[in-house]
């Protein structure tokens, strides 16, 4: 039998928290990129993107960048950066948005996007994903 589980390992929790915080920083940088490509103030950009998630921010940046940068080297470089952000977010989401569960008197698992159970990542594995996000 497998049941929902809240991890208690301090190293896992540290790594999980840092990954979550690093991703919040990434989203903030995407908001600041909206500011730059839209040529608006910080406050205006923050207000305009307040409830936008990572995907919506990347899509908004792509649209604004095509308009403001045209077919340029800068646009291609920005598009490549946005693709790396998308991959980093997907890796982070594997851990943050999935269920953690434990077998009775057994191992701890995380459910994958394809509804399979895999071992809970270690703190060093989470640190590696955090480094991708940063």
Describe every region a protein language model picked out.
Residues 109-134:
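Amphipathic, Lys/Arg-enriched alpha-helical patches that create a basic surface
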């Amino acid at each position: 039998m497998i049941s929902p589980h809240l991890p208690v390992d301090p190293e896992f929790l540290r790594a999980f928290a840092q990954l979550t915080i690093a991703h919040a920083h990434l989203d903030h940088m995407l908001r600041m990129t909206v500011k730059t490509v839209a040529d608006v103030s910080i406050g205006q950009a923050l207000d305009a993107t307040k409830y936008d998630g990572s995907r919506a921010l990347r899509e908004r940046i792509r649209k604004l960048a095509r308009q403001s940068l045209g077919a340029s080297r800068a646009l291609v470089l920005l598009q490549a950066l946005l693709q790396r952000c998308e991959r980093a977010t997907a890796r982070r989401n594997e851990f943050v948005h999935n269920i953690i569960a434990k077998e009775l008197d057994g191992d701890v698992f995380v459910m994958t996007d394809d509804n399979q159970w895999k071992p809970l990542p270690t703190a060093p594995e989470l640190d590696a994903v955090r480094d991708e996000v940063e």
